[in-house]
C-alpha cells in the first residue's frame, strides 16, 4: 500500500466530516466536537493549511492507494513540535510507516525534539518506543489528561 501527502484543501469537505465524526476516531480524540458542520470543517481545513505559512511546517492529508485515509504531521503546541496522526480505523495498521516517514523529514523542516500527546484511552503505546519516543509525563489540555511522549532531536 502506497501513501501520498496532500494539502488539507485537496480533500473534499464531506470526506473530512466523515473522518471527524467517525465514532472510533472520536473515541481517541477527547477534545473533538462530533457535531462538526460544513462551515466549521472548512475553517478548520483552512487553519491546518495555514500552519505551513505560519510555522514552516504543518499537518498534511494522507491518501493510501488513492483513498483518503486521514491526516498527520507536525503542529505547534505550547511552542514545541507536536506530531499528530488521525486515521480512519481501516488504516490504523499503516500508522508506523506513516510516522516513520514524517519523522524522517523533521530535520529538513528544522525540527528537533518532537512530542506526541495521546489520551489515556490509547492503551497500545509500546510501538512508540520502536519509533524513538519515550513517555515523559502527562499534560492537561482543556481539562483533559494526555500522556506525553517525546523523541529527542
Identify the residue ranges that each predicted region occupies.
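Conserved active-site alpha-helix within GNAT-family acetyltransferase domains
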Residues: 100-101, 120-137
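Conserved GNAT acetyl-CoA-binding A-motif
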Residues: 108-120
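A short, well-structured alpha-helix characteristic of acyl/acetyltransferase catalytic modules
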Residues: 1-42, 46
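Acetyl-CoA-dependent GNAT
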Residues: 35-84, 88-90
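Active-site beta-strand termini and strand-to-loop segments that position acidic
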Residues: 63-65, 150-153
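Conserved acetyl-CoA-binding loop-helix of GNAT-fold acetyltransferases
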Residues: 92-106, 130
